[in-house]
Amino acid sequence: MSSATVSRTSRSKATGASSSSISSSIRASPSSSSSGGGGGGGTRRRRRRTGRRSTKRSIISPRRRRMVSVTARPFSRGRSWKTPPVMSRLWVGGGLPCGRDTALTMHLNNCCVGTPPPRDLSESASTGSENLSRKASNQSQSQGRLSTVAGGSGWRSGLFLAEVLLMM
């Protein structure tokens, strides 16, 4: 407590005192440890050697455990990243695993499939319907790409792109 009060009152004197006390403590600790007896140091060294052997064994076993965990992790990571069952569902049946996919498909159905294709099929000779179909095809292209990037149903977006190519 006295050293703290001294350091608060006068900084220069406190720093000098603290440096001298630190140096004395540093000088005292190695001298006491070295002069504490060679037998103690020898026992410490022996303990360290035996400890090193035991730590080596303990290090090898966690490494093996780590290797097992590392070999087991990439499968789960690959499943979470690649998601093969979801892709198979999308390509086989056009299933919708996520709410985002359902929202995208509903949006695509409302924007692209709902009104323009029947008009295009019924009035294919008029130029207005062709313009509408071109606008719809452009929308379906952009939204189909967005759905594929965002993880949407690749099956229906592929059908949209195929229809757009056929219409062009």
Swiss-Prot record:
Q: Which domain of life is it from?
A: Viruses
Q: Where is the composition biased (Low complexity)?
A: 7-34
Where do the record's region annotations for Disordered lie? Answer: 1-81, 119-150
Q: Where is the composition biased (Basic residues)?
A: 43-67
Q: What is this protein called?
A: Uncharacterized protein C-168
Polar residues: compositionally biased ranges: 123-146
Please name the source species.
Human adenovirus C serotype 2 (HAdV-2)
